[in-house]
């Protein structure tokens, strides 16, 4: 694996067990730090992937800058101890987000490009940003300059995106004036409330789609959302994939 620096995550990640052919949790390895030239290559890979998606018929692309994945690792001062243009200052640690977003937008159109961030996120052994207001205020302001179609905010805690008075949410909302998408613990009622208060313009829903094959109908009719079994998320076969029932009216 590669990363901004040779700092391993504590804990385990999902990988394929070659002996059984099934996914299993394995201890995280220490990544190899990308060279500056390799980082430039990563930008090119994002651009090519975006072009491929549009050529395949997708309406747009979303740059994944959240949840402890590569871009989020570059942002994190606890995982990024680089001494080049991608490390050190807040601006340098956010540089990869902005360069990729800029190049992808130039390649496929800003109106077809969004980006996802996860303020306060602790997924995949991430630690909270020590300066969230400064970091995400800067990112929101710079991303607005690119004219992206939307900014997608994921809340792992499923708390702050539901609070229209949350200080960070209000800051981001003020600096990024294009469409704002919110994600994290939304039900139909909570989604309607967030839209009504103007906290967000779009609501994203993830895991409920796994356990609710009729999710859209449930939301329209106000039916309770069925819970999911996270133990089946990474298994092969139909269990936890094709066996969730629809609701009975």
Feature map (PLM): residue ranges:
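Flavin-dependent oxidoreductase catalytic cores
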Residues: 1-249
């Amino acid at each position: 694996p590669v990363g901004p620096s040779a700092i391993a995550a504590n804990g385990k990640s999902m990988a394929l067990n070659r002996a059984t052919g099934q996914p299993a949790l394995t201890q995280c390895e220490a990544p190899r730090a990308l060279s500056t030239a390799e980082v430039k290559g990563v930008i090119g890979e994002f651009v090519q992937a975006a072009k491929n998606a549009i050529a395949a018929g997708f309406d747009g692309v979303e740059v994944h800058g959240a949840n402890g994945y590569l871009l989020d690792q570059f942002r994190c001062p606890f995982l990024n101890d680089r001494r080049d243009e991608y490390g050190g200052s807040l601006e340098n640690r956010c540089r990869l987000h902005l360069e990729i977003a800029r190049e992808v937008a130039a390649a496929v159109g800003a109106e077809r490009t969004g980006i996802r961030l996860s303020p306060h996120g602790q997924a995949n052994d991430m630690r909270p940003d020590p300066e969230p207001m400064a970091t995400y205020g800067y990112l929101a302001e710079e991303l607005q300059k690119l004219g992206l179609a939307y900014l997608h905010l994921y809340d792992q805690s499923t708390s702050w995106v539901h609070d229209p008075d949350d200080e960070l949410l209000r800051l981001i909302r003020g600096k990024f004036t294009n469409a704002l998408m919110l994600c994290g613990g939304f039900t139909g009622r909570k989604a309607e409330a967030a839209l009504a208060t103007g906290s967000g313009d779009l609501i994203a829903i993830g895991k409920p789609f796994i356990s609710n094959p009729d999710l859209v109908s449930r939301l329209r009719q106000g039916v309770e959302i069925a819970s999911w079994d996270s133990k089946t998320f990474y298994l092969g076969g139909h269990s936890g994939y094709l066996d969730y029932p629809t609701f009975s009216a």
